[in-house]
A protein has these predicted regions:
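A generic "structured core" feature
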Residues: 26-29, 52, 94-95, 104-109
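Alpha/beta-hydrolase fold catalytic core
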Residues: 1-26, 47-50, 89-90, 116, ...
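Active-site catalytic pocket residues across diverse enzymes, especially alpha/beta-hydrolases
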Residues: 46, 111-112
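Active-site loop/oxyanion-hole signature of alpha/beta-hydrolase fold enzymes
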Residues: 6-9, 16, 53-95, 99
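Active-site micro-motifs of SAM-dependent methyltransferase domains
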Residues: 34, 58, 101, 125-126
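Flexible "cap/lid" loop of the alpha/beta hydrolase fold
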Residues: 105-110, 116-141
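Conserved HGGG/HGGXW glycine-rich cap/lid loop of the alpha/beta-hydrolase fold
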Residues: 14-64
Length: 141
């Protein structure tokens, strides 16, 4: 495992890289108030893949959000695209936990040509039942 750094439009984005550099590309996105190290326990299970786990701006070893910006959800999407571009990855599998999963889902919807697949852990997603069952399920809950 090695530390990596990318120059995004809003600042320096730090991260960790591990696995097989010749393997399928996977960009790992952590949850709110977390960092790239949260993916270290998964490293042995992903050894055949080229994993880059980033610290989103304002988290871990990455830069703070610069003046004039805030922690807007959409801005992190641009940061993720900056990292994919810096890596030279036209496409990648996205692995997201919590906030990272929500970001991965929105990126897949907005830029599907960049996303090979999604693996989401405790993330937002569509309910696994028909929409007309939603009211009854909420009442039951």
């Amino acid at each position: 495992m090695k530390t990596v750094s990318f120059n995004g439009q809003r600042g320096r984005i730090a991260g960790l890289r591990f696995g097989n550099a010749e393997g399928p590309p996977v960009l790992a996105l952590h949850g709110w108030l977390d960092n790239a190290a949260s993916f270290i326990p998964m490293a042995p299970y992903l050894a055949s893949h080229d994993i880059v786990a980033i610290d989103m701006l304002g988290h871990g070893a990455s830069a703070h959000i610069p003046k004039g910006y805030d922690y807007a959800f959409v801005d992190w999407l641009h940061d993720i695209l900056d990292v994919l571009d810096a890596l030279g990855w036209q496409q990648a599998h996205l692995l997201g936990h919590s906030l990272g999963g929500a970001l991965a889902s929105v990126l897949a919807a907005g830029a599907p040509e960049r996303v090979l697949s999604l693996a989401l852990i405790e993330a937002l997603g569509p309910p696994p039942w028909p929409g007309d069952h939603a009211a009854a399920r909420l009442r039951k809950a």
